[in-house]
Amino acid sequence: EQVDDKVIWITPYRYSKFEPWTETHVLTENLADSSFYIHLAYYYAQTFVFQRKFKESDFAFCFYPLMGGGATIGKVLQMEINRKQHFCLVIADSDKKWSGDVGYGDTAKKVIDVMEKFTPFNCRSYVMQKVREIENLIPRKFVEQYGDNNGYFGIFNLDFSFFDMKVGLCLSELWHQEIFRYWRDMLGDTALFQERNTLRQQCQTKKDFDKVIKGKEPLKKGFGSNLLSLVIGDIDYLTAKKKFKPKMNHALYCITPQDLTPAQQEEWKNIGQLMFSWTCCLKCRI
């Protein structure tokens, strides 16, 4: 096989079990993630390919969703590599805690390690760089509409790219000085961090610090663990919670660059391009 930026060349006699006609397997941390990424594909098509608005029924995206978080995602990805049967696109959160963070979370590390070890011809990976996780890709207007009313909406006047949109800003993340300084400087409220500073001086290690702060409320609250499900109109989740609204996710098809921050624009374009390239298919006309 030969892989370049745009074309994958496959030698049939070497990979006789490979099925290029079947749908791409899209591997994410949760099944709801790939449902959200469909909208990024439509955004990319409207903004960069056709450069016009169209109905979501004009064409289709077809894929088989897979999920795995932490170490599990590496095992699932390796399984896809070993089978050599399908195309597989894997998209992972960076889990970066601040803008200067050069590290990745466990899930992203597993994806990177597996891809570097096997360099598969049938798989492509993408790890977000400009935001912490998928919830940071949700446009502000949807967080304001569906997020927990107790969440810290003031973050939208700042940079929410690395804010934990689900839980909020917790003391547990502020042990490391660079993360603490990042949020202290951004929020501009030294009084907010007095407890953190006092407890950190009393603790010798992060393990001790984590024990002391266990159970404490976030300094700034997030918008709920169900935020993404509410935004995309996850039928199973919403039915269980009796919050199902049939047209809940229709507005996601109408996102424009003006609805997004610069960081979101870059990620929506990158992920949208991959979803468009790897999952776009002909619309059934029967």
Name each model-derived stretch.
Residues 39, 75, 79, 113, ...:
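Charged/polar, solvent-exposed surface patches and flexible loops
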Residues 205-286:
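Charge-biased C-terminal accessory regions appended to nucleic-acid-, cytoskeletal NTPase
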Residues 68-71, 103, 224:
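Glycine-centered flexibility motif
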Residues 1-98:
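RecA-like P-loop NTPase motor core
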